Amino acid sequence: GNISIPEYVKAFVSNTPVQGITPLQVAAYILKYSDIALTWAGKQSLANSHELRITIDDIKTMAWLGKYYAHKIKAATYLAIFRETLQKEWQNKTIDELNASAGYWRHYATIGLSNNHNPLWTNRVGYVDWKENFQWATYEVTSNGGKLNMPSMRPTPGGTILEAENTV
């Protein structure tokens, strides 16, 4: 089964082997399959069908969300290691992952906003406000002692660049 972040950190700090799937392995799996989905979606021809374009955009949206969560898992793991060891390198890794995570939220929201209303009602969590959540994603970087340094983002067809909408 999966190993929790606290269990993993305890084993990591004490240099003890663990049985199961670590949080970093979970993140790697999510990133792998997100990349596969994005590569596949990028090869599809969207010229003939509006419905197909929306479906492909949904696949891309979920892949970007996967990348967001994968980097959040890595950030949470590194932050827990930092809190146990107080070694600055783990705080730096945390900030790097939070910046990556915020950047992927931006990609997720860009495609999501191009096809959906904001905020969007979802059955599981209620309303999701993509712009507000982007602000939270950037706050996570600064509240952990980092500076915003998100990956560059190219505009997508029909997409919205969130910075242009005064969300940062």
Predicted regions and their residues:
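Extracytoplasmic
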Residues: 146-168
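Catalytic domains of carbohydrate-active enzymes that cleave complex glycans
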Residues: 1-154
